[in-house]
Amino acid sequence: VEGSLVQFETLIMKLAKRSGFFWYSFYGCYCGWGGHGLPQDPTDRCCFVHDCCYGKVTNCNPKTATYSYTEENDGIVCGGDDPCKKQVCECDRVAAMCFRDNKDTYDSDKYWKLPPQKCQEDPEPC
């Protein structure tokens, strides 16, 4: 794993104060690789929106593009001259803030390693 996925983990650590790999890799229908069905709770919706955001990125691979950002007032400001990499940074920044803002509804007992049959509904559009 390199590039943006490592940076995404860093942004989650900075903003949500927890490990993205540990807390969000196998959660709900959309957190982790792939995604199917309907988002199960607000945290899973963060991942759904992040997947949709990555799907709209053009001219670079969002999973490997390395972007630049600065930390300002306990927040993240995406920078750099490459519009594609800046878009990837914004996807990651918004998702990390979403994780932070939805910690109180995170339910590992209910949604951690959710069986695939729970994610069979027709997905909603991005």
UniProtKB/Swiss-Prot annotation:
One GO term of the biological process aspect: negative regulation of T cell proliferation
Reactions it catalyzes: a 1,2-diacyl-sn-glycero-3-phosphocholine + H2O = a 1-acyl-sn-glycero-3-phosphocholine + a fatty acid + H(+)
UniProt signal peptide: 1-3
Cofactor: Ca(2+)
GO cellular component: extracellular region
Function noted in UniProt: Snake venom phospholipase that inhibits ADP-induced platelet aggregation. PLA2 catalyzes the calcium-dependent hydrolysis of the 2-acyl groups in 3-sn-phosphoglycerides.
Name of the molecule in the record: Acidic phospholipase A2 S1E6-b
Organism: Calloselasma rhodostoma
Lineage, top ranks: Eukaryota, Metazoa, Chordata, Craniata, Vertebrata
